[in-house]
Amino acid sequence: MNGLFLAGFDAGQTQTRCRLSRWHQNQWLPIAEGLGSGVIHLHASEGEERFEKALRSSFSKAVGNAGLRSEKALISAAAVGASGIEHDTPMQEQAQQLLARCLKIPSNQCLATGDERTALHGAFPQDAGIVLISGTGMICIGRNDQGKEQRCGGWGWLLDEGGSAQNLGQKGLQLSLRMADGRIPDRPLREKLWRALNCSSATAIKALVVQPNFGAAGFAQLAPLVVAEAQVGDKDAIAILEQSAHCIAEAITGVAQSLGLSDPKICGNGGAFEHLQPFRELIEQAIAKRMPTASWIKGQGDALDGALQLALRQLKLNPD
């Protein structure tokens, strides 16, 4: 089969996905996918080794699933989306060099970028639109008809993670400590959160959350419990959800205004948005209040499709 042989990667903390596809006669011909290990922040201890292992393992699996031998998988270009990779930074260059080394192709045929950009180019390959990712963290990014892109959020949970599962869990845990102090009446939320963390005192909570392996994911695991209490009428839990939804509406409005999108199409992604239905409803209500002409749509493709689109652009080709 003729055509360009391309690889797209979506690198996450738990796993990395690779999709192989051919671009032939102006259409995509999917070949195979593979799952590999997860990544951590590239500048963390063992970050580079974990990143390279994730790329190699997922690519090897995809090649095997395609019934090919690695020496026959001659990639024309590749792109990877991973959380925390900022445009035009040394980290982006480092990630691109690693991708090139893994696939044995020139670095100018590789692109490493944030997973929000691969999600955007997957959901809206050619059209204007905004992608929201509300999972452990939160970020949104949009593009207008002139091709200008604008991002909002995604600055890390220590600085700006309103609108995320981490934010819901952390605010809920803070609320539980106020209950333990007697500042507000004790309610079932405190007991449920502490039980989930296997803690029986405020001092145990304090010691737990500073452990290196707790972090954003540790708070995020508590989000469903906060949502559940909001559903049964806990007013403070409801307020946490409403404030977090407001943060998302604020970010999406900022992107839309910056790009001149008066009636933006929005595609929502991420575990908090997709699986915490009451939270999702509040997000939709908050955005409808700020931008009544906005509409929610299902994206044309996923982050791997977006990675393949960006890989093709490395060859100065566009799927038009």
Per-segment meaning from a language model:
Residues A79-I85, S134-T136, I266-E274:
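Glycine-rich beta-strand-to-loop/alpha-helix junction loops that act as flexible
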Residues A100-I105, K148-G156, A286-S295:
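Glycine/charged-rich beta-loop-alpha catalytic/anionic-binding loops adjacent to active sites
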Residues Q109-T118, I133-S134, S295-D305:
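Active-site nucleophile and cofactor-binding loops and adjacent substrate-binding regions
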Residues M1-E71, G122-A128, L175-D320:
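ATP-binding/phosphotransfer module of carbohydrate and carboxylate kinases, centering on a glycine-rich
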Residues I40, F59-C102, A112, H121-F124:
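Short beta-strand-loop/turn "lid" adjacent to the catalytic site in phosphate-handling enzymes
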Residues L6-D10, I75-A79, G129-I133, C140:
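Short glycine-aspartate micro-motif
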Residues D127-M179, R183:
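Glycine-rich phosphate-binding loop of actin/hexokinase-like ATP-binding domains
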Residues M1-N2, S107-V131, K148:
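Conserved phosphate-binding catalytic cores of ATP/NTP-utilizing and phosphoryl-transfer enzymes
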